[in-house]
Amino acid sequence: MSYMIATPAALTAAATDIDGIGSAVSVANAAAVAATTGVLAAGGDEVLAAIARLFNANAEEYHALSAQVAAFQTLFVRTLTGGCGVFRRRRGRQCVTAAEHRAAGAGRRQRRRRSGDGQWRLRQQRHFGCGGQPEFRQHSEHRR
């Protein structure tokens, strides 16, 4: 079975990258509109006029398709960033980056419990980060 772990930071970075790619493609398409849809017949005969119409029709289809792709790309970026926001709101305080975790001293917190033989022992804790993946903090236990 495959698992996918995504953190809000990774989703935000992916959305930013995808948005940048979409912007670059949109600029290139806008620059190409005039050159691709305004093909003129090279001569006065019917064959060259038909070829020019064919190129213009293909260019118009391409630009219509690229507009649909741009709309999908915009929706995809919104979905990524919106999903990240929902994830952050639902996780609340538990959703912190690893750096914030370390800065807060979460790795140094220890809980003790009384074992069956009356000795106090350190207990291993699970801390869940933004990705939903347990981060195990291992503490040494001396067993007799």
From Swiss-Prot:
Q: Where in the cell is it found?
A: Secreted, Cell wall; Cell surface
Q: Name one Pfam family in it.
A: PE
Q: Where is the PE domain?
A: 1-87
Kindly state one GO CC term assigned in the UniProt record.
Answer: extracellular region
| Keyword Nucleotide-binding in record | no
Superkingdom of this entry's organism? Bacteria
Give the signal peptide range.
Answer: none
Indicate yes or no for the key word Secreted. yes
From the record, give the transmembrane residue ranges: none
Tell me the function of this protein. Answer: Together with PE10, induces macrophage apoptosis through human Toll-like receptor 4 (TLR4) signaling pathway. Interaction with TLR4 leads to increased levels of phospho-IRF-3, increase in the transcript levels of IFN-beta and pro-apoptotic genes, up-regulation of IL-10, down-regulation of IL-1b and enhanced levels of macrophage apoptosis.
Task: State the similarity comment.
Answer: Belongs to the mycobacterial PE family.
Its recorded name reads: PE family protein PE9
| Species whose genome carries this gene | Mycobacterium tuberculosis (strain ATCC 25618 / H37Rv)
Taxonomic lineage per UniProt?
Answer: Bacteria, Bacillati, Actinomycetota, Actinomycetes, Mycobacteriales
The gene from which this protein is expressed is PE9
